[in-house]
Amino acid sequence: MIHPPAQKQAARRYTHSVKIGNLYVGSDHSIKTQSMTTTPTADVDATVAQICALVEARCEIARVTVQGIKEAQACEHIKERLIALGIDVPLVADIHFFPQAAMHVADFVDKVRINPGNFVDKRNMFTGKIYTDKHYADSLLRLEEKFSPLVEKCKRLGKAMRIGVNHGSLSERVMQRYGDTIEGMVVSALEYIEVCEKLGYRDVVFSMKSSNPKVMVAAYRQLAKDLDARGWHYPLHLGVTEAGMGMDGIIKSSVGIGTLLTEGLGDTIRCSLTGCPTQEIPVCESLLKHTTTYLNLPRKNNPFALENSESFVNASKKITKTTPWGSVYGVFIKLNEDHMLNTPVEQLLEQLGIHPENGKKDFTTPDGVVVPKSFIGTSVLKKLEQHFIVFHHHEVPCLYDYNHEIWNQEEVLSSPFVHFHASPPFIHSTRDFFEKKQGEQQPVKLVFSKDLDDECEAAVAIATEFGALLLDGLGEAVILDLPNIPLSTVREIAFGTLQSAGVRLVKTEYISCPGCGRTLFDLPEVTKRIHERTQHLVGLKIAVMGCIVNGPGEMADADFGFVGSKTGMVDLYVKHTCVKAHIPMEQAEDELVLLLKEHGVWKDPE
């Protein structure tokens, strides 16, 4: 085994180079952005046009869905057209359920993506089937027999492969033995790479996707650890599957992808946003921009990494003091002089989530605000105090590093909480602080200040750095100081990050796929309408999936599912069970509401 030079271990996990078309991925190369077309692959003109648009948007790898032989044959013409147009972008075929299509399309594309959950084995259908040790061993032999021809062909042709594990579509065999766990995801990946290793084929990239960033981060961390322990340095493609629409999708993707990038993991990335695929690329670029600081630093082990695949609860934090904001993770927004002087107080309250007519709080109203000391005693402050916990920075101790002597001063010990102002790099310095203070019981508010003007960049920055710490279980509250971002957007980012990290649920969560050539309805429009009708159902998870491939499997965490079954038809799910099939699209949204009522989770909007 040839070990990488010492300097290569600085920021990124060492990975060997994999050639995809005329492009290389691995730790010797820049992190690549990629996306997937939403056009029917058999429509060569439309697919080529969308790939050209993606390349214009600076997408570096383009993927298309290949359901069968017709789509595989179309890939030959797509590749020819791209070459004729001078478009040198690697073309990737996405395969589910149909190994014959993979064998056929490998002649025409640069990389083949397969899903271990459905390439050879059956996807888990929750039948309760029991696999004996002999059945399991026989299944592994069958896996090797069915998978080896594709491996040998890709090796012979110099084509790359992605082994893409999805949390929601583990095979029946793996689910029966390991359950719906991180261990099951890792085993699923390792079973396939062992066949590749046996045949001397190493042009492989891995992905370990989930719609839950917490699961996704834990799975990638565990796979990287297990691969490195074996001396296998395969590149990783990062993504949160079915992240959703708009700001919610950006935040959820950033919590997962951003956390891993700051830890040196990841060689290619994709933000799976519902809508036009070109919109994904600026988010990917923003993620890479905001994690550059960490990639230029010596790589550090995370003392709070989620090592245990059975538990996502970090035990290092044991806070016994009661906080003024209660048992939830607190959200505080810093107000500046412009807010206090130039915004009418009723308008300011509305921007903070207070209904102007009845004074009711929105689901994303912060727990409190931080104000300049000069406004103590003013009429504006008195209005704010009717709705929020209000304080100024000098009322509580402000710490910039952990110092045992300072921590044990009476001023700190007697305070209901302390503020921690992290120095750059925010994640590393905060982890250092909490590692040193383990055992101390004082609640800590993390202070997050960013001088950003762009709302997307602000969302990416906060969701990446604050989200990583939430996944570690650090802190009891956050103060967000984003003076150039509208207060309503600051609230959306704060609570969206908490929700994506699974720390504080304040709204309905939507698991919606980005769409591809398999999509059977107008995914963005239908998702938008369902959101409008159900957004008041706090804590509920609803999946809106374009087809049966990404439907029953990828909505692993959803309570209810709205899944395209055939053209113009929708199936409705409760958890993993289809309860209403082939509903005409024009009736399906009303039927979803009826289903929610039947299960006692519906309430009329206020």
UniProtKB/Swiss-Prot annotation:
Its EC number is 1.17.7.3. [4Fe-4S] cluster binds at residues 513, 516, 547, 554. The keyword Ligase does not apply. Keywords: 4Fe-4S, Iron, Iron-sulfur, Isoprene biosynthesis, Metal-binding, Oxidoreductase. Its cofactor is [4Fe-4S] cluster. Binds 1 [4Fe-4S] cluster. It catalyses: (2E)-4-hydroxy-3-methylbut-2-enyl diphosphate + oxidized [flavodoxin] + H2O + 2 H(+) = 2-C-methyl-D-erythritol 2,4-cyclic diphosphate + reduced [flavodoxin]. HAMAP family: IspG. Disulfide bonds: none annotated. It comes from Chlamydia abortus (strain DSM 27085 / S26/3) (Chlamydophila abortus). GO terms for biological process: isopentenyl diphosphate biosynthetic process, methylerythritol 4-phosphate pathway; terpenoid biosynthetic process. One of its GO terms (molecular function) is 4 iron, 4 sulfur cluster binding. Pathway: Isoprenoid biosynthesis; isopentenyl diphosphate biosynthesis via DXP pathway; isopentenyl diphosphate from 1-deoxy-D-xylulose 5-phosphate: step 5/6. This is 4-hydroxy-3-methylbut-2-en-1-yl diphosphate synthase (flavodoxin). It comes from the Bacteria. SUPFAM superfamilies: Nitrite and sulphite reductase 4Fe-4S domain-like. Belongs to the IspG family. Converts 2C-methyl-D-erythritol 2,4-cyclodiphosphate (ME-2,4cPP) into 1-hydroxy-2-methyl-2-(E)-butenyl 4-diphosphate. It is an enzyme of class 1 (oxidoreductase).
